[in-house]
Design a protein with these regions (language model features):
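Helix-terminus/linker motif at the lipid-water interface of multi-pass membrane proteins
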Residues: 28, 32-50, 118-125, 181-192, ...
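N-terminal transmembrane alpha-helices
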Residues: 8-39, 43-44, 57-76, 100-108, ...
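Short runs within selected transmembrane alpha-helices of multi-pass transporters and secretion channels
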Residues: 70, 74, 138-156, 164-172, ...
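Short alpha-helical transmembrane segments in multi-pass integral membrane proteins
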Residues: 1-20, 77-143, 189-245, 301-373, ...
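Generic alpha-helical transmembrane segments of integral inner-membrane proteins
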Residues: 24, 28, 32, 36, ...
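Transmembrane helical elements of multi-pass membrane transporters/channels
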Residues: 18-37, 137, 171, 204-208, ...
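Membrane-helix boundary and inter-helical linker elements of multi-pass secondary transporters
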Residues: 42, 79-82, 157, 190, ...
Length: 457
């Protein structure tokens, strides 16, 4: 293949775009949903947005391992399609559903431990109570998101992203409506604050499941993909666990790292925690579209890997990398130039809470410039790591992520012990993100992933 084939092939840009556009729209809906959630909570009180940022991050830390496992159904499905084993697709996704239900039971049990956990974290008492309530509701309802991740693999692995988009965006729209009603107590419903925000997230997740199941169990799906094969298949279950556990561990490591980051920031004060929580929400505006692009690319790379067309795999990853950086450079420029405009969208109404939003704004403007710098490296991380995951190279990436993360964890723990300020801690996190892309590039060029077989036997 020529250099043009790897980087400048219009057909590949079009293929990635065709699969990515529905995912981009779905992720745009998710970003809008998260923005609406954050703005409603910020207007309710700065304490509420601070608590939801920490509670949401801990929820993601707990659930990310299981989402990584059950969500790997998409990669196995894509590889099966490429290897012409369509009759195994339904069974793969049923194994993911069973694992999702089991994981849901485990997170319900963890939901009873939220209060002692946040006492251990040591945030301000009024923040602890809100964090505990928010996290408890999310953990009780996490099974909804696990089942969504497994069923979503059936659609994304086959490249059927339009139906996946329709299901996900319906839930996102419902979430915004329920958020408004349950946070502020509208339309005869009780005013529930952060608890209402968490409850809205869980309840709205049921609608996409219903829509996806309707398509999953249709007659044409049963005939072509054997989606009626619902029995346990230990061989396929073992393959899902073999690749999915490593993928889930990497996701968990990432979530645990940023949870620790928020814990340490929270000990600096509520202003710092609220500003960081809002900066993270704004960061999602940058990376969510990249995830959509990378997932579209991952489907194509997985299918080509299943067909053993390895040069095509690399070409799709390279084209996705170009598209990702173009977007990130554009959004980073607005973060650097217009930080106050972004933060003012989260200005609070009324006198609820314990901090003045003006203090949050002053701190947040600087934090958003950190985001503008590190999101350029984050684009590479997302495109390259999803590319490696799509070809089954989950164990190596998980090990390397663990090693690099331990270094940052040591720095963060020392920062907490030595009472570093907010900006030195953010500087350490930025350096960490920018250090990862060379690692993924090395692994891609090394080529060991070519010997991995992901498709079921």
């Amino acid at each position: 293949m020529t250099l043009r084939d790897y980087w400048l092939n219009p057909r590949k840009y079009m293929e990635i775009t065709r699969l990515a556009v529905p995912l981009l729209l779905s992720n745009a809906g998710l970003v809008f949903m998260q923005f609406a959630d954050a703005m409603f909570l910020a207007k309710y009180s700065p304490d509420a947005i601070a608590a939801s940022g920490m509670g949401g991050m801990v929820s993601w830390m707990v659930s990310s391992l299981f989402v990584g496992i059950v969500g790997y159904t998409s990669v196995i499905t894509a590889n099966n399609i490429g290897a012409h084993q369509e009759d195994k697709v339904g069974c793969v996704n049923w194994q993911g559903i069973y694992l999702a239900l089991l994981a849901g039971v485990l997170t319900v049990l963890l939901g009873f431990l939220t209060a002692p956990f946040f006492r251990l974290v040591g945030h301000a008492p009024e923040i602890q109570a809100l964090e505990s309530e928010y996290l408890r509701v999310l953990l009780f309802g996490n099974v909804v998101f696990f089942v969504q991740a497994s069923l979503g693999g059936y659609f994304s692995g086959r490249g059927d992203n339009v139906r996946l988009m329709a299901a996900q965006m319906s839930g996102q729209a419902l979430n915004v409506v329920l958020d408004y009603a349950l946070i502020f107590g509208k339309w005869g419903l009780p005013e529930m604050g952060v608890t209402g925000a968490a409850l809205a997230t869980v309840l709205s997740g049921l609608l996409p499941i219903a829509i996806m199941l309707a398509y999953f169990l249709r007659c044409d799906a049963r005939e072509r993909y054997h989606t009626h094969h619902w029995r346990l298949h230990w061989g396929i279950m073992a393959r899902l666990l073999r690749f999915g556990v490593a993928s889930g561990i990497q996701m968990w490591i990432d979530a645990a790292l940023w949870t620790l980051f928020l814990v340490i920031i929270g000990r600096l004060g509520t202003v710092e925690l609220a500003a960081t929580s809002i900066a993270f929400r704004l960061n999602s505006l940058a990376f969510m579209p990249i995830i959509g692009l990378a997932r579209g690319m991952g489907t194509l790379a997985g299918q080509r890997h299943g067909a053993r067309e390895f040069q095509e795999v690399v070409a799709y990853i390279c084209h996705c990398l170009v598209m990702s950086e173009i977007w990130m450079i554009s959004i980073a420029a607005t973060y650097a130039l217009l930080p106050e405009w972004y933060f003012r969208m989260f200005s609070a109404d009324g006198s609820r809470g314990t901090v003045d939003f003006a203090e949050v704004l002053a701190t947040g403007k600087t934090l958003l410039r950190f985001v503008a710098v590190y999101c350029l490296g984050d684009a590479c991380n997302i495109a390259l790591s999803i590319g490696l995951h799509s070809v089954g190279d989950t164990r190596w990436t998980s090990i390397m992520m663990s090693i690099v993360t331990l270094i940052l964890v040591a720095v963060l723990l020392y920062a907490g012990y030595a009472h570093w300020g907010l900006y030195p801690i953010w500087t350490a996190a930025t350096v960490f993100i920018l250090a990862l892309p060379p690692i993924w590039i090395f692994r891609l060029r090394q080529g060991n992933w070519k010997a991995i077989r992901v498709a079921t036997d």
